[in-house]
């Protein structure tokens, strides 16, 4: 079972819900829920086959890119810097699973 992957998916999902409650951004909520579900699906696939990292890798790369750009513009650690950093760590972890 890919507990780290499921934890990452839960963090993204609950982070989008928390952000919606705090700021009220519906597009951000929808995008966060979609990406969180996609990360959860990727963790499910990794749980069944350790080498099946395509969905998880795509999701982490997508989030690292989007949130990295947001962090570069805003210079704010929360939430963009945190999510970009966690996504980069997920990418590293998934690449190591392939070795």
Swiss-Prot record:
GO terms for biological process: apoptotic process; negative regulation of apoptotic process; negative regulation of mitochondrial outer membrane permeabilization involved in apoptotic signaling pathway; regulation of heme biosynthetic process. It is a multi-pass membrane protein. Expressed at significantly higher levels in ovarian cancer tissues than in normal tissues (at protein level). It is found in: Mitochondrion membrane; Endoplasmic reticulum membrane. It comes from the Eukaryota. GO terms for cellular component: endoplasmic reticulum membrane; mitochondrial membrane. Keywords: Apoptosis, Endoplasmic reticulum, Membrane, Mitochondrion, Transmembrane, Transmembrane helix. Disulfide bonds: none annotated. The chain crosses the membrane at residues 1-21, 24-44, 79-99. PANTHER family: TRANSMEMBRANE PROTEIN 14, 15, TRANSMEMBRANE PROTEIN 14A. Inhibits apoptosis via negative regulation of the mitochondrial outer membrane permeabilization involved in apoptotic signaling pathway. Belongs to the TMEM14 family. This is Transmembrane protein 14A. The lineage of its organism: Eukaryota, Metazoa, Chordata, Craniata, Vertebrata. The gene is TMEM14A.
């Amino acid at each position: 079972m890919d507990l780290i992957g499921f934890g990452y998916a839960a963090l993204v999902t609950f982070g989008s819900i928390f952000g919606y409650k705090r700021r009220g951004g519906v597009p951000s909520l929808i995008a966060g829920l979609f990406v969180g579900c996609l990360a959860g699906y990727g963790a499910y696939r990794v749980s069944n086959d350790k080498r099946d990292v395509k969905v998880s890798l795509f999701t982490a790369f997508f989030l690292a890119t989007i949130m990295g750009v947001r962090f570069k513009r805003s210079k704010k650690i929360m939430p963009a810097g945190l999510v970009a950093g966690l996504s980069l760590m997920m990418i590293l972890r998934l690449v190591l699973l392939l070795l």
